[in-house]
Swiss-Prot record:
This is Large ribosomal subunit protein bL20. Coiled coil: none annotated. It holds the Pfam family Ribosomal_L20. One of its GO terms (biological process) is ribosomal large subunit assembly. Keywords: Ribonucleoprotein, Ribosomal protein, RNA-binding, rRNA-binding. It comes from the Bacteria. Belongs to the bacterial ribosomal protein bL20 family. GO terms for cellular component: ribonucleoprotein complex; ribosome.
Amino acid sequence: MARVKRAKNSRKNHKKVLKLAKGYYGGKSKLYKTANESVIRALRNSYVGRKNKKRDYRSLWIARINAATRINNLSYSKFMNGIKLAGIDINRKMLSEIAINDPKAFTELVEVAKKQLNA
């Protein structure tokens, strides 16, 4: 039985990793071992970053809504509770966009929430 040397496969894998490491500084773009470590770390960080982006945007939307509701003398949590009681089903992204681009409409939403809280 012939010995399998895997030269073709390892060359293909090395080229793939070095292609992904293109633009890295120094040996990280030229040496397979360090390039592989850098690529693995970069791919892991990009995966984590995609998950964190969702959290970051939600936090941003909440901060914007909170700022807009406090201008109208209401806290964020009470506003969200009032909106829920009123049966208005708008997500936080849309609420933050309304707060920025159409303050009058947002003030009307705050008034609806206040009425529901007092009722």
